[in-house]
Amino acid sequence: MKISMGFDSFKAIMKACKPFISKDNARPILQTIKLNCSDGYCIASACDGFKLINFKVPCSADNGVLCIPIIKTPTKGTQVIITDNEKEITFDFITEKQVVRKIEGEAFKTEGFITNDEPTIRIGFNPKLLKDALDGFTDEKIVKIDVIDERKGFILRGTNKEALVLPVYLRK
């Protein structure tokens, strides 16, 4: 399988998926990004067993699936061509190449976990503010999220602390 995409798209995939890669060596396939290519698009998925991300970018490839590891990307580039060579994967950045060992195993199934059902409530948040609020609870094992109303945001509750995260207005 051969996948060609813009360098910026590839770099964005690496950045977005890295926090969703498993740190555990028990299931090496969860330390990869699944690239599912069809109809001129690539859906990059990463799952560590607890959280999942899907990220869609344009590409040029035959329909198919390839699992790739996180790699260090060059600082500059215009395009990347990813080639599956049975036991290795080649990343050709035009100015340089990287060849890595292919991780054995069947690609993890990500379809259907993130539903396309119509939501009962939709709330918009500034991701930086949301992260800042959650960072205050990193010492907790569990954080409860209480949603009162889409205009009132939600309340994060820990053992002995709570935080209010206000929403961003969404046009309907």
Stretches with model-predicted labels:
Residues M1-K172:
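DNA polymerase processivity clamps
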